[in-house]
Amino acid sequence: MRECISVHIGQAGVQIGNACWELFCLEHSIQPDGTFSDPPSSDDSFATFFRETSMSKYVPRAIMVDLEPTVVDEVRTGTYRHLFHPEQLITGKEDAANNYARGHYTVGKDKVDMVSDRIRKLADSCSGLQGFLIFHSFGGGTGSGFTSLLMERLSVEYGKKSKLEFAIYPAPQASSAVVEPYNSVLTTHTTLEHSDCVFMVDNEAIYDICHRNLDIERPTYTNLNRLISQIVSSITASLRFDGALNVDLTEFQTNLVPFPRIHFPLVTYAPIISSDRAYHEQLSVAEITSSCFEPNNQMVKCDPQQGKYMACCMLYRGDVVPKDVNVAIAAIKTNRSLQFVDWCPTGFKVGINYQPPIPTPGGDLAQVQRAVCMLSNTTAIAEAWARLDHKFDLMYAKRAFVHWYVSEGMEEGEFAEAREDLAALEKDYDEVATDLFEDENEAGDS
């Protein structure tokens, strides 16, 4: 088997975890107590995410960690309390108080050995561990500080195993702390060399999608997380179901990451429509494919027209045949002004999974016959870093709030180091897009 272990860290990670496991259970007909509602089919691909116990119960290969108990306690007492083994839910007594240094140096340090042991137990129950999916936010103290501490540890203990992150990018609408830019820059710097691929989700983009496409007046975290869980489900469907293509974690990297540091694909999902609208719309493969190139459906606010594509991966699910996909992609190539970098063939990697998306009961999304999730590596995503770096600079110029970090044992030099690394990352993106212009001009002159 090629198992994946999911690690949910901090409030955002755990709450997204709740939404994801609720959806995975629905998709695989597993009840909240871990038993099957329908007898399992011969396809046991779901075992990549669930482990069977001696009592024929299915337990998620997952761990939830938070440095304070309230959010994980909701799992311990909620509908899915019997799904997880108590040892998979780990909490501390005091939170990281939105402070990266507390999550990484003081409070987090005390917990990392225990978390590491629990992950080791999960890994030992796998026959061929493929890698880790790590869910967290950039802005929280636990999400930023503890995640980077744990990723360093995973790199040491499981060297070559893939590590993919689903990371929540801070947004003004749903901001929970003024120091989010500090935490985000620090965690990105620390995890850059440990992470293989990071799918960023910008809360502001998701907030707007819920508001605009799903007619939710004031979207809550529950609304946001349910939408995020559909995206995670699409990206991981090929690992959990027998599919035609894209079955492996390493395959994502091979197809999406041209250089080790340029590992932040842009995620777009379609169709995102409410039940009322779905009633009146028939969404063909061509239409949903075209929707993926609308900036309104992106999970991070940026303008792909201003950037260049390095790679594109289309993951379809439901009632989709390859012929329709080929026609749809050919139309995109002719109708849209997609700019690919010169050194990259304009091939689209396609995955098709025949399992249609299942909406959560009582959720906001309509039941549709087919959906697509596009993962594209585009230089436009550097805009997200530029926004974050700008906010970091405004505060750091005044050294605002820095004493809270230093008093937790962090050195002030780490701020400058992290900021320089992100400046280098922005420059890397620039070079990927522009280096080749110079070559063209020289070729044109000669």
Curated annotation (Swiss-Prot):
EC number of this enzyme: 3.6.5.-
Pfam families registered for this protein in UniProt: Tubulin, Tubulin_C
UniProt-listed InterPro entries: Alpha_tubulin, Tub_FtsZ_C, Tubulin, Tubulin/FtsZ-like_C, Tubulin/FtsZ_2-layer-sand-dom, Tubulin/FtsZ_GTPase_sf, Tubulin_C, Tubulin_CS
Organism: Gallus gallus (Chicken)
UniProt keyword rRNA processing present: no
Enzyme class: hydrolase
Residues forming the catalytic site: 251
Biological role stated in the UniProt entry: Tubulin is the major constituent of microtubules, a cylinder consisting of laterally associated linear protofilaments composed of alpha- and beta-tubulin heterodimers. Microtubules grow by the addition of GTP-tubulin dimers to the microtubule end, where a stabilizing cap forms. Below the cap, tubulin dimers are in GDP-bound state, owing to GTPase activity of alpha-tubulin.
Keyword Coiled coil: no
Sequence motif MREC motif, residues: 1-4
UniProt protein name: Tubulin alpha-2 chain
Cofactors required: Mg(2+)
Places the protein is found: Cytoplasm, Cytoskeleton
Catalysed reactions, semicolon-separated: GTP + H2O = GDP + phosphate + H(+)
Superkingdom of the source species: Eukaryota
Extra information: This tubulin does not have a C-terminal tyrosine.
